[in-house]
A protein has these predicted regions:
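Extracellular/virion structural assembly segments
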Residues: 1-84, 145-182
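Autoprocessing Asn-cyclization modules and mimics
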Residues: 74-143
Length: 182
């Protein structure tokens, strides 16, 4: 699977995300209302990204990637500043415990890497137990060990725009839409 982060072309600051929970709602005559999540993947997200005044070389990397995926094939990506590098503050089988973090559902199904091992091991986050504890697919983290979480999710991009403000440079705007697939 293609990974957008491998391009090493970081979007401009000021990127934004839109999230709108999908909810089934039943309204009753007396003003009573019932709500339930619409499926298990009810938090879609769209990211508005820009790369302004980028050299043709960097811009062409982004354009080629988007053209290769053609809005059809999902790719891995995680937004800038969402990667976590920290040290575990507790230990338990198949758990990552870090009292300095605030884990959210955003980290479900992401990759955790044991940063201190000479041959780094990885595991997948299978459950967010609390704001400070994650359940992992393998027992790779011990108390005091450094780790990194790369919160990769799958996205598609079927809309992008390219302009050339001056020769040799390009502006690109794109919308990354999260897709829910294995």
């Amino acid at each position: 699977m293609a990974n957008f982060n491998d391009l090493n072309v970081i979007p401009d600051r000021g990127l934004s995300t839109d999230q709108s929970a999908r909810v089934h709602m039943a309204n009753y005559g007396d003003g009573y209302e019932q709500r339930v999540a619409a499926g298990i993947n009810n938090l879609p997200e769209e990211w508005s990204l820009t790369w302004n005044n980028r050299s043709n070389a960097d811009a062409n990397k982004v354009i080629k990637f988007l053209e290769d995926e053609a809005g059809v094939t999902a790719f891995d990506w995680y937004p800038p500043d969402t990667e976590i590098s920290s040290t575990a503050t507790g230990a338990s089988d198949n758990k990552l415990i870090d009292s300095a973090q605030t884990f959210t559902k955003r980290y479900l199904n992401t990759t955790v890497t044991d940063s201190t091992s000479p041959t780094p091991q990885t595991a997948t986050v299978t459950s967010v137990d609390s704001a400070t504890q994650l359940t992992l697919s393998a027992n790779i983290i011990s108390n005091g060990e450094a780790y990194t979480i790369n919160p990769y999710k799958k996205y598609k991009c079927s809309t992008w725009n390219v302009t050339t403000p001056v020769l040799g440079y390009k502006n690109i705007s794109a919308t990354f839409i999260r897709v829910f697939e294995p």
